[in-house]
């Protein structure tokens, strides 16, 4: 199975890619390697995936909000699944740089939906965030809990994607 993993250099993306490779899948990883946190750690994760996978791991450093770059990198490649973990993270930073969140978390998400639609990808999994529950004080959160009062732009973008 060939799986596209966005956010492949992040902690969850890296762990997922390792697991998929361990079971024999082919993984195409995408990440923009932004400097929201330590880029060297992200590069180490990509190097580890390459070292452990033979030729079953391919990595593209790109911003999936750029549809031309996304389509170009995946031209001629058939995808069986998409696991969309990539996003501009951080609640506080969303107040300082809202355009980054609109581009990555909204436009980028639409690009991945369109990619899946045009390529007839059978399944796409999206990772949202507990931030969508806003100021909810009930713990643990439940799927039935209200998510209509986001407290940050980050939360609003994640909720919009749901």
Regions found by a protein language model. Name each.
Residues 1-162:
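N-terminal Rossmann-like NAD(P)+-binding domain of SDR-like oxidoreductases, especially those catalyzing
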